[in-house]
């Protein structure tokens, strides 16, 4: 069994390294395109953003607040009663690889409590949810469902106005230059924190709307193939971890576990 465990651990580590490389590759593509655009021959100028090179001359350096249709808002600061069924209530754990994973929700809340949450914030398609508290601060996901749900305090909601294409902003918020801004802006207490007003003050490089759409379409296609590869590798890792657990069960109990 020791030899089997070693082999499983080795394969898992190799797969995880591949996943890390794919994620770095994905971020490098996103950063290149949201800061340079799709036209290599365009005139450029100094972006004046720390850690960022020149950008196309006709693009703008804007505050996040200027491209939002509402102020950045986080979820309720109290812990609600959770149930086995009802309205999904999500927190930071549900933000996985740029998407919302409802299987990792915090639990269910009552319709009555969700009505209260809705007075503060009601999720809509194309909203961007950002983790603002804890080890994964800065990670984001886009709302892509009409399903009713709500968010807890570690998440902040960002809603774009008509000047900004939400998909473009979704990618820009994953770029190295934006993540670097967040890292320089968050505060530390018991854990790293990014305030909602701080998010509003961060800078974003904004092309004209038609270019934003073109970039978003390009990155949707490019990132979809990378995400598929990442998902396949993660599936392998999960299967191997479950297999190892079943072997441990067998060692401890002398019985095969049905998985």
Region annotations inferred by a language model:
Residues 132-133, 148-156, 167, 187-213:
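A short glycine-rich beta-alpha junction/loop motif
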Residues 47-74, 201, 205-209, 213:
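Non-catalytic DNA-recognition/assembly elements of restriction-modification systems
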Residues 45-46, 89-93, 105-114:
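Short, structured beta-strand/loop micro-motifs enriched in basic residues and often containing a Trp
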């Amino acid at each position: 069994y020791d030899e089997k465990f070693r082999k499983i651990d080795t394969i898992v580590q190799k797969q995880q390294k591949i996943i890390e490389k794919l994620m770095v590759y994905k971020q490098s593509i996103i950063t290149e395109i949201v800061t340079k655009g799709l036209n290599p021959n365009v005139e450029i100028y100094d972006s004046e953003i720390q850690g960022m090179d020149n950008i196309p001359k006709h693009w703008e350096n804007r505050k996040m607040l200027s491209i939002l249709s509402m102020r950045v808002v986080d979820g309720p600061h109290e812990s609600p009663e959770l149930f086995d069924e009802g309205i999904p209530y999500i927190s930071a754990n549900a933000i996985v690889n740029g998407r919302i994973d409802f299987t990792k929700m915090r639990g269910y809340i009552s319709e009555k409590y969700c009505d209260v949450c809705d007075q503060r914030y009601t999720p809509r398609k194309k909203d961007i949810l950002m983790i603002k508290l804890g080890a994964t601060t800065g990670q984001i996901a886009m709302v892509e469902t009409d399903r009713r749900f709500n968010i807890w305090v570690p998440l902040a909601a960002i809603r774009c106005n008509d000047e900004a294409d939400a998909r473009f902003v979704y990618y820009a918020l994953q770029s190295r230059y934006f993540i670097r801004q967040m890292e320089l802006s968050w505060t530390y207490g018991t854990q790293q924190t990014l305030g909602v007003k701080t998010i509003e003050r961060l800078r974003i490089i904004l092309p004209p709307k038609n270019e934003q759409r073109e970039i978003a379409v390009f990155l949707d296609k490019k990132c979809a193939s990378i995400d598929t590869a990442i998902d396949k590798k993660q599936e392998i890792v999960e299967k191997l971890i479950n297999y190892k657990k079943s072997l441990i069960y067998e060692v401890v109990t002398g019985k095969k576990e049905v998985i």
